[in-house]
């Protein structure tokens, strides 16, 4: 007999999610383009590679952010024993946003030193703000819905995660607001937040 979605184990959805995270994080490097021969012949290969620093910066920030998301996503699934339809859809929305990250990453890399850099930075910070909101909603549903958490889930750990994740949307909102004032501050906040949540995930 096939199990109902609300009674199913989390293995399939976690495996699918891992694949999506892996693909999204791999696609980031495709936006770092190999210098064209015409440019190399003019300024040299070293200078051409160094001129790609906006792409390196955008790649590093997005890679760190997606990696930390994946770690925290795994953390959620280590505490969840069952899923329901709402959990499926919140997780699906999260994955949709994650797969979109390579686009604002490429946009930021292309326009980081362009007069339209603030627009690119706002799109970049905006996607992570949206991810933070959905991530919180996914966890809130898992933590409060009846019977989704595993019996072994420690209540103190659940409460600690809830408090930790609660700050995410507000902090990314700061990064989004800063994008209209200073591109560098906005991107810097996004990078620092990736480090912050990486450290907190081990707390």
UniProtKB/Swiss-Prot annotation:
It comes from Chamaesiphon minutus (strain ATCC 27169 / PCC 6605). One of its GO terms (biological process) is potassium ion transmembrane transport. Keywords: Ion channel, Ion transport, Membrane, Potassium, Potassium channel, Potassium transport, Transmembrane, Transmembrane helix, Transport. This is Potassium channel Cha6605_3372. The record marks 23 as: Hydrophobic filter residue 1. A motif (RxxxFSD motif) lies at residues 12-18. Residues 44-50 are annotated as: Short helix H2. The record marks 27 as: Hydrophobic filter residue 2. Residues 1-7, 79-84, 143-154, 200-203 are cytoplasmic. It holds the Pfam family TMEM175. Homotetramer. Residues 37-42 are annotated as: Short helix H1. It catalyses: K(+)(in) = K(+)(out). Belongs to the TMEM175 family. In contrast to canonical tetrameric potassium channels, lacks the TVGYG selectivity filter motif and presents a completely different structure. The six transmembrane regions are tightly packed within each subunit without undergoing domain swapping. Transmembranes TM1-TM3 are positioned on the inner circle of the channel tetramer and participate in inter-subunit interactions that are central to the assembly of the ion conduction pore. The record marks 30 as: Hydrophobic filter residue 3. The chain crosses the membrane at residues 8-31, 53-78, 85-110, 118-142, 155-181, 184-199. InterPro entries: TMEM175-like (IPR010617).
């Amino acid at each position: 007999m096939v199990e109902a979605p609300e009674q199913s184990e989390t293995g399939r959805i976690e495996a699918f999610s891992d694949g999506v995270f892996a693909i999204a994080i791999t696609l980031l490097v495709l936006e770092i383009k190999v210098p064209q021969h015409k440019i190399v012949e003019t300024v040299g290969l070293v200078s051409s590679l160094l001129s790609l620093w906006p792409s390196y910066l955008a790649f590093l920030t997005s890679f760190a952010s997606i990696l930390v998301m994946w770690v925290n996503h795994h953390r959620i699934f280590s505490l969840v024993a069952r899923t329901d339809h709402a959990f499926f859809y919140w997780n699906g929305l999260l994955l949709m946003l994650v797969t979109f990250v390579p686009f604002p990453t490429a946009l930021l890399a292309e326009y980081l030193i362009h007069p339209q850099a603030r627009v690119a930075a706002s799109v970049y910070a905006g996607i992570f703000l949206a991810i933070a909101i959905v991530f919180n909603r996914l966890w809130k549903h898992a933590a409060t819905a009846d019977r989704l958490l595993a019996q072994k889930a420690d209540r103190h750990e659940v409460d600690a995660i809830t408090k930790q994740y609660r700050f995410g949307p507000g902090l990314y909102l700061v990064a989004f607001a800063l994008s209209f004032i200073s591109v560098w501050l906005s991107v810097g906040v996004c990078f620092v937040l990736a480090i912050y949540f990486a450290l907190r995930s081990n707390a």
